Structures are given as structure tokens and as C-alpha cells.
Amino acid sequence: MSYQGGEFDVIVVGAGHAGVEAGLAAARMGANTLMLTLNLDAVAFMPCNPSVGGPAKGIVVREIDALGGEMARNIDKTHIQMRMLNTGKGPAVRALRAQADKFLYQHEMKKTIEEEENLLLRQGMVERLIIEDGECRGVITNTGAEYRAKAVVVTTGTYLRGKIIIGDLAYESGPNNMQPSINLSYHLQELGFEMVRFKTGTPPRVNGETIDYDKTEIQPGDEVPRAFSYETTKYITDQLPCWLTYTGDKTHQIINDNLGRSPMYSGMIEGTGPRYCPSIEDKIVRFNDKPRHQIFLEPEGRHTSEVYVQGLSTSLPEDVQLDVLKSIPGLEKARMMRPGYAIEYDAIVPTQLWPTLETKKVPGLFTAGQINGTSGYEEAAGQGIMAGINAALRVQGKDGLILDRSEAYIGVLIDDLVTKGTNEPYRLLTSRAEYRLLLRHDNADLRLTEKGYEIGLIARERYERFCEKKAQIAAEKKRLESITVKPSKEVNALLEEVGSAPLKEAVQANVFLKRPEVTYEHVAKVIPAPEQELSADVAEQVEIQIKYEGYISKMLQQVERAKKMNDKKIPEDLDYDAINGLATEAKQKLSEVRPLSVGQASRVSGVNPSDISILLVYLEQGRLAKLGKKTV
């Protein structure tokens, strides 16, 4: 028996990392929002690694914060350790990574949601969508509750027809033995969505009290205070270490001897797994020439003995997992608390989405996170905030927000998904971004805070601080151009100390700073101080912008050329079959993806430069024909 559960502007289905960002974004933009989740105790749950950030992913977390999202602030309050990665490399690949207290992370995120004014959090299993006049108008739960809305965001993670597999044991389940969502997956197929079956996995957890840490290498956090959020002012200083150990010949022998019992090789697992996060049995087979593989031991929180055995993701039978653990230095006597497992789940083919993450088949329906074929909390959260923003903008009758590939890693992620699709769980990598020098950890606010303010996610007070920071950067760059550094004894002594060639003639301070060995801190020692003391963030930004000015300038020229192609819009209803000369494959792929611009069309798999030339001629002929009609 059904009943009317209420009317909302936006409904978010799921409260994982995509769902919480979607719900908070929509609510903070003024939309009356309902968030439905299978289990109130699993809000922002971390079923796999207890960490946030890393290469590319850490920059996404910064971007979420710059737009006005929550992940960065939450991990800053709940981490047990932070490290800046790739500090010996250029700024384009530097990224922050935090070990989370996964239980505190959940608690704090749930508290934030419960306290949000326009957001109602409720437990319930959504089984069907309400479709009226071809549009999504709400959801129906298994208890018969009908909730109506102007937009719905589905963020179901790995719960859609979830199946856990350990050895020859397989059963319907969401992650960590939670209830799966079965009927919603079938309903999406009924609506005509093309689905795929993906797989991911997780390693065993062991009791930290039973680890022999003397046989491992300690991995401490950075002593320098770190934070993801631009708003964080209080830093956690009592960090917990992680530890490093390795597999060995014995480990590899045990796994090789039991490959016949592995679901990966017995045919039990049908779903495609993540290329960049392989199981330990996959690593042993694919990289059989490697004598050992890294294993990181990561505490799951401050008030638990559970330790995550990172690098040992597996679906081998439980008895084999125990033998594998005993073969690893430091884990000989470790007690397993939870076995590793593989989980299969359904996802939609993401080329069925517009770049706003609204589905093409059903207007008013948005999807975000692992349902779109991605892996990782950060990728999910990045999609979540964009889906929430665009759902709220739809309710407001406004155009959606689409981030360009040159503006954000989130833009790269979404463009890759909706334009190219994915045949495996998609992981964001720095190599996927052609403009990665522009998409740095340090400048996410300069790229996106303006947009966050315009849509109503950034408060005026924060925006004013941001504007002041921009002004300070510009003023200091200009000041350095006006100051001359002369080849004095003091200057050349400094240069000798840092291993740089002596200065032979006077140069501008900004030119002096361009020397590879010279930092802003060095420059500050040999020139007058600015009227106002600069923050470390401003000084870092000044240094990077000056040092990489030439490279950045070249990349901006590339962006401008690409923009010309992106500015050439394509009608949504364009009949590609009517374009003479277009290759058959191009017609099929373009009809499926329905790119919104020539730039996007050029990135569709199977579309060649010759196809783009023909498309450009066709669009130009259409434009001229329209002009001719207007002048008649």
C-alpha cells in the first residue's frame, strides 16, 4: 500500500560520498532536499581504504572545497595523518593524502547533514522512480512511501545488485555485508538504461595489537601542518603512523598454488575490475617477475584495533587469506578480523548522461558516483557536488554548471565519462589531464571559488577573503617586477649556498625568482619586505606563477585554441545520419554520445579528424542557411 511521503525540490538516493555532497550542495543552494539511504549508520561510509586524497584525487578534494563542498573540511577534522606527495616533483603533480579515522569521518559527516537547514536525512530503500510525462518526478520506497520532487539524484555506489564473493562463496550484499539494492537496478533497466557489471575488492583487516611492527618500516605523517580546505585554521598535530612491509617468495607461492580456488580465475567473477587497483592474485600473475609488492598497514581509526592491509585486496578463500597474511613480515601472528572480498555491482553506461550528469533518457534524473562507472571516494564526491548543483539549478530554472577540462580535474573526470565512457571502473589520474599544469593542488580556489560564489555555495565573507588573496598575489607579482636585485656579496653568497650560478648583472626580482634553485623565501632575504606580510599560500602562489610563467602561458594558448572548438555548439537533436561523408562509426558514436560542442565531438572514441572536418562544414552550411532565411 502506497502513501504520500512528502514533496521536495530535490531527492538524493544514497548517502555515500557522492550522495552527501549532492544533498549538501542542493540544500545549501536553497533547495528543499530529501536524502534517502539504506542505512543511517552507513552515511559517508568508507568500505575500502581509510584514506582521502592522493595523486589527482587530492586535487579533486581541493576543488570540491573551492566550490563549497564538504569532503575537505570533514577530513581536516577527522584524519589521523597527512602527507604531501611528490614534493620532489613539480607543482602539477603534488597532491595531499590523508589517513582517515573512518568512524569519526562518518560521525562528523552525518552530524553536518543532520544540522543542515534545508536537508532531511531519512532511512529508506528506493525501488522505483516516479516518471510522469517522460520526466523524473520522485521516488517510491519498498515501504510504499511516494516522495515527489522536481529533480532526483541517484548515488547508489556498489549497492545495485551487489554480490560479495569470497572463494567459492557468493551472496547478495552491499559492501561490508550491508543490504543491497536489487529492484532499483531492474527498474533502471526497464526504463531503457544500458547497464554494465563491474567489480571491485577490498583486503582483509587485522588486529593491530597482533602485528610485529619491529619487522616493518614506519611511515609517519608530515611534521608541517597540512589541510585540504582553504578554510581550515585548526590543525591536528597528534598523528598516528602507518607501516610498510612487503610480500615475498612464500606469499607468491601460496597464491600461485591456490589460483584455481580464486574466483578471479575460476570464472565466478563476471564483472570487470579496476585496472589501477588490482587484487594481490592479479598482481602476482601480471607481474610475475617482481620479487615483492608493497603492503601498507593503515589504522582504521583512533579507537579501534582494526588495521587495513593496503595492497592485499583479494577474493581468495578465507583459509588461503590466513596463510597469505602469515607469510608477510610483521603479520606472522596477526589475527584477521575481517576477510577480504570482491564485490560485483551494476553501473550505467555513462555516455547516457549529459555533461551536467542529467540522464538523456529521463530529464530530471541525475546520477553520480560509482553508478556512473567510477572508482574512489573522491571521484564520487566530485560528481556528487556537480550533480547536486545541477539538480538545484534545474529546480531554479537555470542553465547547468559544466566545468571545462582546463578548469578542473572534476571537469576532466565528467568529460571522460560522458564523452568516452569506460569499460572498467574509472580512476582519475594526472595523465588524463592535458592541462594539468593549470589544475594544481595550490590553485583550486583561484580556479573555482568564483563559480562557487556565483551559484550560492560560497558565503560572502569567504569570498571577500578570496578576493583579498587574489589582490595580494597580483600586487606582490607587480612589486617584484619593480625591484632590482644587484650582484652583491650577500646575493652571490646566497646563490652559492643554494647551488646556483653567481649573479653578474642586476635583474628584476621576478627574473631572479625564476632560477630553479631560488625560492620566494630566498628572494625575500635580499629585497625589502612588502608593506603587508604575506601568508604562506600567497607566497607559494607568487612563486609558482612566476617560475612557471612561460609554461603556463603556452598552456593557456592551447586552452584558447580548444575553446574555439568548444564554442562551436551542436544542436542536441542533430541527425548525424543526414550528414553525407561522415563515417558509419562516427555516425553511431556521435548519435550515442550527442556531444554539445565540436570540441566534445572531437574527443568521442571512434571519431576521426576527417569526421570533425565534415561535421564543421555541415554545421557552417546550416548556419549560413539560417542566415539566408533571416535575410529573405
Curated annotation (Swiss-Prot):
Binding annotation for NAD(+): 273-287
Name of the gene this protein is made from: mnmG
Any one Gene Ontology molecular-function term assigned to this protein's record: flavin adenine dinucleotide binding
Name the UniProt record assigns to this protein: tRNA uridine 5-carboxymethylaminomethyl modification enzyme MnmG
Requisite cofactors: FAD
GO annotation (BP), single: tRNA wobble uridine modification
Primary role: NAD-binding protein involved in the addition of a carboxymethylaminomethyl (cmnm) group at the wobble position (U34) of certain tRNAs, forming tRNA-cmnm(5)s(2)U34.
Native source organism of the sequence: Halalkalibacterium halodurans (strain ATCC BAA-125 / DSM 18197 / FERM 7344 / JCM 9153 / C-125) (Bacillus halodurans)
Protein family (similarity comment): Belongs to the MnmG family.
Entries under Pfam families matching the protein: GIDA, GIDA_C_1st, SAM_GIDA_C
Highest taxon listed in the record's lineage: Bacteria
GO cellular component: cytosol
PROSITE patterns given in the database record: GIDA_1, GIDA_2
Subunit architecture: Homodimer. Heterotetramer of two MnmE and two MnmG subunits.
Subcellular location: Cytoplasm
Keywords: Cytoplasm, FAD, Flavoprotein, NAD, tRNA processing
Residues reported in the UniProt entry to bind FAD: G14, A15, G16, H17, A18, G19, V126, S181, Q370
